[in-house]
């Protein structure tokens, strides 16, 4: 795996870290934790590539990317619901996020379906809340995972960098969208 692959993984980590910090400071803890999980995947990917521990860290990187992604997206959805006035306890939101990640671990084919369904729900809820930036970000991520990720047409290098660049852009859109919404009740 070429060293330059670490650049866009690091970008994901930086954007997610910044977004998580900003969301935490504005009392959006579920969204902050959701972004932090995506950032953790970026950190692990960056360490994996720059350290040369490609194979030893492969399963950890894949697991955190996929299962952390499911849990992170569930937490983003929970924050959207909380911002819409639903009294959703933190324990319930965390429990659902963990349960969905466990389900995806037990049935890997279901993980991709869950991710797509949650993205569609996030688009709809963001549009309903008039959070156009958030909706655009979630829609971009939906297109990213269906058209860009591991695309045979783009080649390995371009596919990797474009995918991670779009993930970082999605996280930025989502964070900025949450920051424009009122504080959770």
Language-model segments: what does each one mean?
Residues 1-37, 46-63, 73-185:
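Polytopic alpha-helical membrane-helix bundles and their juxtamembrane interface segments
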């Amino acid at each position: 795996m070429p060293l330059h692959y670490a650049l866009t993984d690091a970008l994901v980590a930086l954007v997610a870290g910044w977004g998580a910090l900003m969301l935490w400071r504005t009392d959006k803890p579920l969204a902050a934790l959701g972004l932090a999980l995506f950032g953790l995947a970026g950190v692990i990917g960056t360490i994996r590539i720059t350290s040369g521990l490609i194979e030893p860290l492969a399963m950890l990187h894949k697991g955190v990317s996929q299962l952390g992604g499911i849990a992170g997206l569930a937490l983003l959805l929970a924050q959207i619901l909380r911002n819409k006035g639903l009294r959703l306890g933190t324990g319930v939101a965390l429990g659902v996020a963990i349960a969905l990640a466990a389900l995806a671990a037990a049935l890997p084919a279901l993980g991709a379906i869950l991710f797509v369904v949650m993205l569609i729900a996030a688009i709809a809820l963001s549009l309903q809340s008039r959070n156009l930036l958030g909706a655009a970000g979630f829609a971009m991520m939906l297109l990213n995972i269906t058209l860009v990720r591991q695309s045979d047409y783009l080649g390995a290098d371009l596919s990797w960098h474009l995918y991670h660049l779009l993930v970082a852009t999605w996280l930025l859109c989502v964070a900025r969208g949450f920051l424009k919404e009122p504080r959770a009740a």
